[in-house]
Amino acid sequence: MTLIDGSKIAATIVAELKAEVAALTGRKPCIALVRIGEDPASVSYVKNKERTAAEIGLTGRVILPPVTISQAELFALIDGLNADAGVDGILVQAPMPKHLDELQVFRRIAPEKDVDGLGTMNLGKVAQDDDTGFVSCTPAGIMELLSRSGVDLKGKHVVVVGRSLLVGKPVALLALQKKAGANGTVTICHSATKDLPAITRQADVLIAAIGRAGFVTADMVKPGVVVIDVGINRVPDSTKKSGYRLVGDVDFPAVSPLASQITPVPGGVGPMTVAMLMKNTVKAYRLRQHRAG
């Protein structure tokens, strides 16, 4: 079994971006990070994104509107960022307060600044194999992990467990694309799938993104499978100062001996998500420069 070290691969991507940004003349790429409320995970995620942006040499502009902000007020804020020539990418951190419609918020971001890749236009471009759009960061990170770990999906059965807008649907589309590293045969499983283990045991590459701790067990995989564990779940652990530890959707101790390659949690997909956000921001900057002539 080989561990796919997402932290190491993400650090390589950050170093590549740092060199690319250092060579730019004039204004540096800028990402606006909008966080609404004090959800502990969101606070941590945004700080991490701000820190990584600074490490690369990007400008990270953190915006903290009140938790009571209305949909109309948030739209006005986004419209202002859309019109701001000094902003290349916009991310509104999810989850948002319940009174806000997240899907409408994602759609409000201008497609050319939608570096989180969750708007309608960019999701559509993924379906069309159009490289001018932005791929949502976790699916993009998964594909990058596979590529840099020597896993070519051509001719392989890729089973995705989970059908979310954030991971399941876009990663399935990416695995299907007619391009190098992709061309997989894809099955998507979800809560209504019958005899799930019979399907997951067919997987050459298994992507688990269901949000349930230890859901994928040893009897659900075949020997030699490549496992990408997207889940980040908190489980009680009295030995930890925080009172919990992070585990994935895969029962790592049981499944890892059967896998040819597997991502850990933490340190697998998570670091890649931030790295790909930064990569998308630099791409947005370059596309805008190109359009400006």
UniProtKB/Swiss-Prot annotation:
Keywords of this entry: Amino-acid biosynthesis, Histidine biosynthesis, Hydrolase, Methionine biosynthesis, Multifunctional enzyme, NADP, One-carbon metabolism, Oxidoreductase, Purine biosynthesis
Family: Belongs to the tetrahydrofolate dehydrogenase/cyclohydrolase family.
PROSITE patterns: THF_DHG_CYH_2
InterPro entries: Aminoacid_DH-like_N_sf (IPR046346), NAD(P)-bd_dom_sf (IPR036291), THF_DH/CycHdrlase (IPR000672), THF_DH/CycHdrlase_cat_dom (IPR020630), THF_DH/CycHdrlase_CS (IPR020867), THF_DH/CycHdrlase_NAD-bd_dom (IPR020631)
Catalytic reaction equation(s): (6R)-5,10-methylene-5,6,7,8-tetrahydrofolate + NADP(+) = (6R)-5,10-methenyltetrahydrofolate + NADPH; (6R)-5,10-methenyltetrahydrofolate + H2O = (6R)-10-formyltetrahydrofolate + H(+)
Residues given in the record as NADP(+) binding sites: 162-164, 191, 232
One cellular component term from this protein's GO annotations in UniProt: cytosol
Pfam family, one: THF_DHG_CYH
GO terms, biological process: L-histidine biosynthetic process; methionine biosynthetic process; purine nucleotide biosynthetic process; tetrahydrofolate interconversion
Origin species: Opitutus terrae (strain DSM 11246 / JCM 15787 / PB90-1)
Molecular functions (GO terms): methenyltetrahydrofolate cyclohydrolase activity; methylenetetrahydrofolate dehydrogenase (NADP+) activity
UniProt keyword Acetylation present: no
Pathway terms, separated by semicolons: One-carbon metabolism; tetrahydrofolate interconversion
SUPFAM superfamilies: Aminoacid dehydrogenase-like, N-terminal domain, NAD(P)-binding Rossmann-fold domains
Gene: folD
Protein name, as recorded: Bifunctional protein FolD
Function field: Catalyzes the oxidation of 5,10-methylenetetrahydrofolate to 5,10-methenyltetrahydrofolate and then the hydrolysis of 5,10-methenyltetrahydrofolate to 10-formyltetrahydrofolate.
Complex formation: Homodimer.
Classification via NCBIfam families: PRK14186.1
Coiled-coil blocks: none
Catalytic activity, EC: 1.5.1.5, 3.5.4.9
